[in-house]
């Protein structure tokens, strides 16, 4: 009996071990199959994400849409009934920008350097110029239509080009000069188109006030770009480093200016954010801030997957849909002069882009000389 009992116990242990081994192998096979499916799915989704990330047309479309979104949302807020908290609007946009790029950095999508006091001191003059540029831009957009604003913005290119000649030894080619003449012509045509739509003395006053802010913005923008170019050489900032410091340092300046120069009485706040469209206005303010990040990100994306040449052409072509968006979403003047100015300005941008490409090509073909 002892032998039989020992034999039966041995058989039982053998069966248990066999059952456990079979079950374990089945579980391992099931896990392997699941991993294979997951790997295939991940590979497929990863492949799709890679295709999108490396798609030139998608990057170009994203850049154009982000540009239009920012312009339209800014115009929506600024054209609201008696909106006068421009500094506050710009502060909100800068805060949203900092939060957005901080979130993107935490997700390892973008990277930028940590805050440094010495670099902040070197960069602080740029922050003041940025505030001057974006404030005058907001005032110009408040009084001018999007097409006219977009056309007159081209004049900044002329100031920057001749600023580069003076400060950096740049050169203005014959083709570039031709594009400048077209830019001036488009601005003159836009002026006639705007004047044709004037119906009252108040409209004329608002129009000329818009031109004043636009002219101021052109000089402020040119000064910002030229001086920032010098500072970038000192600090060796990349795109998102520049965005980080620009927005971070401008926030306190904008908030202080808002609290000092703007009316924060309950009546004025209610006037700027009426109950009927308060949520829509705040949403537009947040979207305009986020879209500024989108423009910078899509700019870098477009250059990476296409070329700087393609990007410069896209920048020129992009002025047409931005100008047309003003005709579609807002009551901009639509007449022969206004429509003609859009296409002349569009042509000027194309000629300038081609001129810059030819100039860069000639410079790259020049062999370095040594004494």
Curated annotation (Swiss-Prot):
Keyword Endoplasmic reticulum assigned: yes
Keywords from the UniProt entry: Cytoplasmic vesicle, Endoplasmic reticulum, Glycoprotein, Golgi apparatus, Membrane, Sugar transport, Transmembrane, Transmembrane helix, Transport
InterPro entries reported for this sequence: TPT_transporter (IPR050186)
Glycosylated residue positions: 268
Lumenal side: 73-80, 139-145, 193-206, 263-281, 330-332
Main location group: Golgi
Transmembrane segments: 52-72, 81-101, 122-138, 146-162, 172-192, 207-227, 242-262, 282-302, 310-329, 333-355
Segments on the Cytoplasmic face: 1-51, 102-121, 163-171, 228-241, 303-309, 356-371
GO MF annotation, one: antiporter activity
Localization in the cell: Golgi apparatus membrane; Cytoplasmic vesicle membrane; Endoplasmic reticulum membrane
Bilayer topology annotation: Multi-pass membrane protein
CC annotations in GO: cytoplasmic vesicle membrane; endoplasmic reticulum membrane; Golgi apparatus; Golgi membrane
GO biological process per UniProt: GDP-mannose transmembrane transport; hyphal growth; protein N-linked glycosylation via asparagine
Subunit structure: Homooligomer.
Role: Involved in the import of GDP-mannose from the cytoplasm into the Golgi lumen. Involved in hyphal formation.
Family indicated by similarity: Belongs to the TPT transporter family. SLC35D subfamily.
Name assigned to this protein: GDP-mannose transporter
Organism: Candida albicans (strain SC5314 / ATCC MYA-2876)
């Amino acid at each position: 009996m002892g032998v039989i009992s020992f034999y039966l116990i041995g058989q039982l242990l053998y069966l248990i071990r066999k059952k456990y081994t079979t079950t374990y192998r089945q579980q391992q096979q099931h896990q392997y199959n699941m991993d294979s499916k997951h790997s295939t799915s991940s590979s497929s989704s990863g492949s799709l994400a890679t295709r999108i990330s490396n798609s030139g047309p998608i990057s170009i479309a994203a850049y154009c849409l982000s540009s239009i979104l920012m312009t339209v949302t800014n115009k929506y807020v600024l054209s609201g009934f008696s909106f006068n908290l421009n500094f506050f609007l710009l502060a909100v946009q800068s805060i949203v920008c900092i939060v957005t790029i901080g979130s993107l950095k935490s997700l390892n999508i973008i990277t930028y350097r940590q805050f440094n006091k010495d670099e902040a001191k070197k960069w602080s003059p740029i922050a003041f110029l940025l505030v001057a540029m974006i404030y005058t831009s907001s005032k110009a957009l408040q009084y001018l239509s999007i097409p006219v604003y977009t056309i007159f913005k081209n004049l900044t290119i002329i100031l920057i080009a001749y600023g580069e000649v003076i400060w950096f030894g740049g050169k203005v080619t014959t083709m570039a000069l031709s594009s400048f003449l077209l830019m001036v012509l488009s601005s003159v045509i836009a002026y006639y188109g705007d004047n044709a739509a004037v119906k009252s003395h108040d409209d004329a006053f608002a129009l000329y006030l818009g031109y004043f802010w636009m002219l101021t913005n052109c000089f402020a923008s040119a000064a910002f770009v030229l001086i920032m170019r010098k500072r970038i050489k000192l600090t060796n900032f990349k795109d998102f480093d520049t965005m980080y410091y620009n927005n971070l340092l401008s926030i306190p300046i904008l908030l202080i200016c808002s609290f000092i120069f703007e009316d924060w009485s309950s009546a004025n706040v209610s006037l700027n954010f009426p109950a009927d469209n308060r949520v829509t206005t705040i949403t537009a303010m947040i979207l305009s801030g986020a879209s500024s990040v989108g423009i910078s990100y899509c700019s870098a994306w477009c250059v990476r997957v296409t070329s700087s040449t393609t990007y410069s052409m896209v920048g020129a072509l992009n002025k047409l849909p931005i100008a047309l968006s003003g005709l579609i979403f807002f009551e901009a003047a639509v007449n022969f002069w206004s429509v003609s100015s859009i296409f002349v300005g569009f042509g000027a941008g194309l000629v300038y882009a081609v001129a810059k490409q030819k100039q860069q090509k000639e410079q790259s073909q020049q062999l370095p000389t040594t004494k």
